[in-house]
């Protein structure tokens, strides 16, 4: 169970689903070899991929290239279906940081074959979250610095104002397709600079006004008995 500080207590992170955005920062779309999309590109990550702050990301043996992606995450506060953009903030509980860890080689292989690429996003430990949840009333998410360091060196740096599709648009779009339940998480996309992780790496990911999410990285082979 993951419990994150929230208001004067703690919040149990128990989503029915994690909805993530692909290519929601134009420069990231281009570094992936694509043009910015004309409508949101969404995919799902399993809740079983979640881990809390100061935990361990495990690099699976099946992948030779695992990348980091830092994202501003939205926590849904109440049931949402067909929500218009102008009312979207009424359905938000708060904000946190989520790392969309990705097995890039498996993703590329799936894309080449025309397959869905859930395999690249769904490994255990591939959705670190934290370090806390900030009440929506305490943070304007429209223009925040977002970044990530590996071993003290900056890899990713951007601002949430660079999102192609803003949070209200995302909630309107997603809730027109599927019902959002309390606790569901929307990971809003990543700025450019994604890159590989290796055994022993230390990650510091931040979003202005939320804090720093710290994780360590180990190879699966190093923990097998």
Curated annotation (Swiss-Prot):
Binding site for a divalent metal cation: 69, 71, 100
Record's keyword terms, sorted: Metal-binding
TM region positions: none
Record InterPro entries: Fumarylacetoacetase-like_C, Fumarylacetoacetase_C_sf
GO molecular-function terms, A-Z: acetylpyruvate hydrolase activity; metal ion binding
Pfam families: FAA_hydrolase
Recorded family membership: Belongs to the FAH family.
The protein, known as: Uncharacterized protein PYRAB13970
Lineage: Archaea, Methanobacteriati, Methanobacteriota, Thermococci, Thermococcales
């Amino acid at each position: 169970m993951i419990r994150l500080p929230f208001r004067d207590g703690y919040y149990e992170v128990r989503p029915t689903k994690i909805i993530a955005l692909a290519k929601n920062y134009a420069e990231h779309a281009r570094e992936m070899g694509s043009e910015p999309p004309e409508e949101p590109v969404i995919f799902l990550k399993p809740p079983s991929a979640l881990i809390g702050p100061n935990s361990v990301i495990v690099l699976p043996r099946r992948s030779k290239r695992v990348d980091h992606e830092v994202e501003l995450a939205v926590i849904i506060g109440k049931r949402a279906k067909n929500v218009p953009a102008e009312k979207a903030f009424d359905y938000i509980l708060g904000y946190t940081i989520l790392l969309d860890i990705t097995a890039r080689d498996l993703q590329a292989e799936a894309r080449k074959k025309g397959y869905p690429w859930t395999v690249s996003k769904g490994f255990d430990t591939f959705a670190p979250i934290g370090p806390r949840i900030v009440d929506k009333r305490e943070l304007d998410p429209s223009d925040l610095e977002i970044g990530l360091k590996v071993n003290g060196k900056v890899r990713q740096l951007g601002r949430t104002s660079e999102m192609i599709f803003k949070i209200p648009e995302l909630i309107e779009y997603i809730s027109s397709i599927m019902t959002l339940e309390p606790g569901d998480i929307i990971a809003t996309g990543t700025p450019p600079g994604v890159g590989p992780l290796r055994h022993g790496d230390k990650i510091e990911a931040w979003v202005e006004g939320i804090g720093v999410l710290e994780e360590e990285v180990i190879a699966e082979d190093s923990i097998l008995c």
